């Protein structure tokens, strides 16, 4: 059985999320999974609706989120990440489908974000493992 993945990718910090998306696609192929659809959203906070759309599809086995939440001058990064992570988990439980978190942050500098682009690979691997094990 080939595992079909949906990607939800944030455009904010696109220099990072583009690299992450490419790594995620390569790793999916390495694991024998297929990225069936990719939805680009403005930012991490905007992901839940796109995740829900993919979770509703019978031809998607799991959803991988890809984004990067970088620290700013306010606590905005904390708020964005906390709410997004909570909703992402809720959608996984609501649809009984793996939704994995490939979003490093919050409290992270841009340099630290560059060092964490491999989070996309981790999220793809988690999605594939969950589909196989559940």
Curated annotation (Swiss-Prot):
**Looking at the record's lineage, which domain of life comes first?**
Archaea
Where, in this chain's numbering, is 5-amino-6-(D-ribitylamino)uracil bound? Answer: 12, 44-46, 68-70, 101
Q: Any keyword Metal-binding?
A: no
Q: Name one Pfam family in it.
A: DMRL_synthase
Judged by the first EC level, this protein's enzyme class is transferase
Q: Which HAMAP family match?
A: Lumazine_synth
What the entry lists under PANTHER family is as follows: 6,7-DIMETHYL-8-RIBITYLLUMAZINE SYNTHASE (PTHR21058:SF0), 6,7-DIMETHYL-8-RIBITYLLUMAZINE SYNTHASE DMRL SYNTHASE LUMAZINE SYNTHASE (PTHR21058)
Which family does the record assign? Belongs to the DMRL synthase family.
**Role according to the record:** Catalyzes the formation of 6,7-dimethyl-8-ribityllumazine by condensation of 5-amino-6-(D-ribitylamino)uracil with 3,4-dihydroxy-2-butanone 4-phosphate. This is the penultimate step in the biosynthesis of riboflavin.
Question: What's the name of the protein?
Answer: 6,7-dimethyl-8-ribityllumazine synthase
Which species is the source of this protein?
Answer: Methanosarcina barkeri (strain Fusaro / DSM 804)
Q: Which gene encodes it?
A: ribH
């Amino acid at each position: 059985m080939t595992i079909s993945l949906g990607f939800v990718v944030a455009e904010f910090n696109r220099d990072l999320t583009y690299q992450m998306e490419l790594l995620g696609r390569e790793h999916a192929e390495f694991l024998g999974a297929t990225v069936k659809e990719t939805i680009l959203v403005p930012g991490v906070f905007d992901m839940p609706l796109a995740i829900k759309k993919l979770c509703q599809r019978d031809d998607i086995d799991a959803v991988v989120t890809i984004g990067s939440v970088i620290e700013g001058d306010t606590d905005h990064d904390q708020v964005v990440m906390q709410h997004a992570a909570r909703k992402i988990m809720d959608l996984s439980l609501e649809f009984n489908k793996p939704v994995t978190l490939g979003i490093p942050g919050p409290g992270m500098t841009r340099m630290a974000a560059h060092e964490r682009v491999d989070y996309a690979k981790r999220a793809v691997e988690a999605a594939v493992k969950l589909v196989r094990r559940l």
